[in-house]
């Protein structure tokens, strides 16, 4: 039960971040400046991926071992949850960035973005609560990071034109 609560908490924290990933840069014109500086779209994507992951996912990954003592989990269960959360959170963050880049021009459409992204989070959550599924979760995250890189580049290219 604890694993499910943690994964739902991670999904909700990323849904809160969903409207802020590119919107502040988009609203104040910094995204135009960044795109005119001829910085690679992949560098923009990787910087957003790391900044969103450090801001929204890393605190949850750090807090999980502390909270697991409240639920009387063993060391093995705590390590399992932390490793799965670490592996899956990159894929969930990459998915959020890709959806936000593709729907960047839409103002205040957090509900539409949420409806699109929640079904994409379900495989991460299913494999995240299963014990011993970290290799599958890691592969799923790597695939999501690669596909999201292309989707984010496409979304930024559409905006730049």
Regions found by a protein language model. Give the residues of each.
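Membrane-interfacial helix-loop-helix connectors in multipass membrane proteins
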Residues: 1, 65-86, 132-136
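Helix-loop-helix units of permease transmembrane domains in multi-pass membrane transporters
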Residues: 24-51
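Hydrophobic alpha-helical transmembrane segments that constitute the membrane-spanning cores
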Residues: 46-71, 91
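A structural motif at transmembrane helix-loop-helix junctions in multipass membrane proteins
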Residues: 86-118, 157-161
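Hydrophobic alpha-helical transmembrane segments in multi-pass integral membrane proteins
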Residues: 121-132
């Amino acid at each position: 039960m604890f694993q499910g609560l943690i994964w739902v908490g991670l999904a909700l924290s990323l849904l809160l971040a969903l409207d802020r990933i590119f919107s502040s840069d988009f609203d104040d014109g910094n995204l135009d400046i960044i795109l005119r500086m001829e910085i690679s779209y992949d560098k923009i994507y990787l910087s957003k991926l790391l900044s969103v992951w450090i801001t929204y996912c890393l605190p949850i990954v750090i807090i999980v071992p502390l909270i697991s003592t409240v639920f009387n989990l063993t060391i093995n269960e705590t390590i399992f949850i932390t490793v799965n959360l670490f592996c899956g959170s990159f894929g969930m963050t990459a998915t959020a960035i890709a959806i936000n880049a593709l729907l960047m021009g839409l103002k205040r459409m957090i509900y539409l973005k949420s409806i699109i992204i929640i079904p994409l989070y379900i495989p991460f959550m299913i494999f995240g609560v299963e014990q011993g599924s970290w290799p599958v979760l890691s592969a799923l995250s790597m695939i999501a990071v690669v596909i999201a890189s292309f989707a984010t580049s496409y979304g930024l290219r559409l905006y730049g034109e």
